[in-house]
Amino acid sequence: MDVASARSISSHPSYYGKPICSSQSSLIRISRDKVCCFGRISNGMTSFTTSLHAVPSEKFMGETRRTGIQWSNRSLRHDPYRFLDKKSPRSSQLARDITVRADLSGAATPDSSFPEPEIKLSSRLRGIFFCVVAGISATFLIVLMIIGHPFVLLFDPYRRKFHHFIAKLWASISIYPFYKINIEGLENLPSSDTPAVYVSNHQSFLDIYTLLSLGKSFKFISKTGIFVIPIIGWAMSMMGVVPLKRMDPRSQVDCLKRCMELLKKGASVFFFPEGTRSKDGRLGSFKKGAFTVAAKTGVAVVPITLMGTGKIMPTGSEGILNHGNVRVIIHKPIHGSKADVLCNEARSKIAESMDL
């Protein structure tokens, strides 16, 4: 936004009782009495600063407040409505109430996949009930897992199908009262005796529940800290989940070696190639570890797209559960001997299906 654009912003009557940022609104009112600043030009540089519902003060104040998905800084030492023009020594003063066109307001608009509405009481209650159902069912089912564990180690030490059946039962009980899963492409799943590397986008804590409900005996990769959690950590250990210590290169190498060993023994493994949950619903870049394992062992890569879990339980809001349904798309297996090719093809399939 240059100086000419700044000067073209005209005063406008109040459309809203408080400042908002929404790509659905044609105009946005930014009011000085709320101490909101949209932009500043100084020394040829443009900076955007916003602060909602701040209390004005005569003294210097430096604050950091959240607007949408952006972190913004505000200082009351300078007039936020004064724009400096390099071509002219004088400054131009904006009106008290200003209106910004939608193309400028979109700069501070969060991604539409994960808006940040006010959390409803019903979502909080659903989140509490979800935790209660999952906790009670896990407490009872862990007993079956413990009883059967010696036999699993004796007869099925790598795939551990019995434990995965218990995990599927637990996940199905936990999510059944709260949301439905629509699955597409079940015919693309390899047989239970065919090892494969499964990869998926990662949006929410609910991704694990959703994937366990598929009933496939694949081994997840999980942070070592989760293994110490009672019941959940015990179940993960008995299922053969592969531990990984983040930011530890040696642990990463050991993790990949363990995955290759499992694949050679007939078990499947599951990776979230993004490495973490997405905070805005967008697909991040893929790490190549999963595809290196597939290329070296010669097994297929099965891409899976998850949609809807991030809206039901957004990242960072694990205590709430919104209404909604989940869509799972299982893509055709990908074969190849080059990790780069496998990585690009798998990501392309997931990205294309997310744009539908």
Swiss-Prot record:
Location(s) in or outside the cell: Plastid, Chloroplast membrane
Chemical reaction(s) catalysed: a fatty acyl-[ACP] + a 1-acyl-sn-glycero-3-phosphate = a 1,2-diacyl-sn-glycero-3-phosphate + holo-[ACP]; a 1-acyl-sn-glycero-3-phosphate + an acyl-CoA = a 1,2-diacyl-sn-glycero-3-phosphate + CoA
Enzyme class: transferase
Entry membrane topology: Multi-pass membrane protein
Keyword Lyase in annotation: no
Interval spanned by the transit peptide: 1-56
Function: Plastidial enzyme of the prokaryotic glycerol-3-phosphate pathway that converts lysophosphatidic acid (LPA) into phosphatidic acid by incorporating an acyl moiety at position sn-2. Utilizes palmitoyl-ACP (16:0-ACP) to produce phosphatidic acid containing a saturated group at position sn-2, which is characteristic of lipids synthesized by the prokaryotic pathway. In vitro, can use 16:0-CoA as acyl donor. Essential for embryo development during the transition from the globular to the heart stage when chloroplasts begin to form.
Listed name of the protein: 1-acyl-sn-glycerol-3-phosphate acyltransferase LPAT1, chloroplastic
Gene: LPAT1
